[in-house]
Amino acid sequence: MWRGRDVISARDFGRRDLEELFETARYMEKYSKSRLEFLRGRVMAVAFFEPSTRTRLSFEVAMRRLGGDVIGFWGAEGTSVEKGETLVDTVKMLDAYSDVIVVRHRYEGASKLAAEVAESPVINGGDGAFNHPTQAMLDVYTMWREFGTVDGLNVGLIGDLRHARTVNSLLETLTNFRVRVYLISPEYLRPRVETIDYVQSRGLKLSFHTNVEEVIHELDVLYVVRIQKERFIDPLEYEKVKGSYRITVDMLKNARRHLIILHPLPRVDEIDHRVDATPHARYFRQAALGVPLRMALLYLILQS
């Protein structure tokens, strides 16, 4: 089901796809610090037009752990892109050199365009404000590993839910499971209407809240994204809102004992650092699982 497929949108993958990916990732966990030879002789090209730490590094480590090689660039500086080379021409060049291409771009649809011109599979490493499918796969995989299932979970999403592309892809991925989602944000930072309409049409149960303390006692998972300061005209309004959506140790006193807190990272100040020492913190394990998850993804796409 996976071999040779592009990974452009979370909407393209169903439950069976995800379950196969998760089972393969769990196998890969045993080898996430070893070196295998599954992809020996294969080359992954990375075309990252935007900054990235975890996505880029986990893809690189994953490919090397599988025995493959990595080429590419991280930012346009020092490349022909800086001279004005188009995305299409850049992708065609990378396609000639590699077996799979990972693209990260600020413009929505960049990965889809790359897939249309490349013969090799293309993986969306994050584009525009609404797509980051492999992060969503990692987020749901972390839930699956923590609880043994995703079905039946109460999942809270808190912060700037409109402008975080991880949120959009996560909601789309969660439509494959029987979960209830609590959207916790100011009304003007809720996900865009198109996303809400789509996930509800797929049967995802949503409820809307402005205060996390009203619902924290019901949650199994709390997924935190930062409030994006650059979206506010009034700095005072930003400071007011930011403080209302910050996770603290005191806030967790009413949480379920098994609640896990996830974050796609990087964290700014939306989670108090003292939360790191609580049994609820799972965001660093979540980031670490990015290697076996992406090992599984590359293996399934490139397997002979």
From Swiss-Prot:
Protein's UniProt keywords contain Transcription: no
This protein's UniProt keywords: Pyrimidine biosynthesis, Transferase
Sequence positions that bind carbamoyl phosphate: R54, T55, R104, H132, Q135, L265, P266
EC number annotated for this UniProt entry: 2.1.3.2
Pathway: Pyrimidine metabolism; UMP biosynthesis via de novo pathway; (S)-dihydroorotate from bicarbonate: step 2/3
InterPro entries: Asp/Orn_carbamoyltranf_P-bd, Asp/Orn_carbamoylTrfase, Asp/Orn_carbamoylTrfase_sf, Asp_carbamoyltransf, Asp_carbamoyltransf_Asp/Orn-bd
A GO molecular-function annotation: amino acid binding
Residue sites binding L-aspartate per the record: K83, R165, R226
Protein's GO biological process: 'de novo' pyrimidine nucleobase biosynthetic process; 'de novo' UMP biosynthetic process; amino acid metabolic process
Record has Transferase as a keyword: yes
Reactions mediated catalytically: carbamoyl phosphate + L-aspartate = N-carbamoyl-L-aspartate + phosphate + H(+)
UniProt family annotation: Belongs to the aspartate/ornithine carbamoyltransferase superfamily. ATCase family.
Assembly and binders: Heterooligomer of catalytic and regulatory chains.
NCBIfam families, A to Z: asp_carb_tr, PRK00856.1
Function of the molecule: Catalyzes the condensation of carbamoyl phosphate and aspartate to form carbamoyl aspartate and inorganic phosphate, the committed step in the de novo pyrimidine nucleotide biosynthesis pathway.
PANTHER family to which the protein is assigned, alphabetical: ASPARTATE CARBAMOYLTRANSFERASE, ORNITHINE CARBAMOYLTRANSFERASE, MITOCHONDRIAL
Protein's recorded name: Aspartate carbamoyltransferase catalytic subunit
Native source organism of the sequence: Pyrobaculum neutrophilum (strain DSM 2338 / JCM 9278 / NBRC 100436 / V24Sta) (Thermoproteus neutrophilus)
Lineage, opening ranks: Archaea, Thermoproteota, Thermoprotei, Thermoproteales, Thermoproteaceae
Name of the coding gene: pyrB
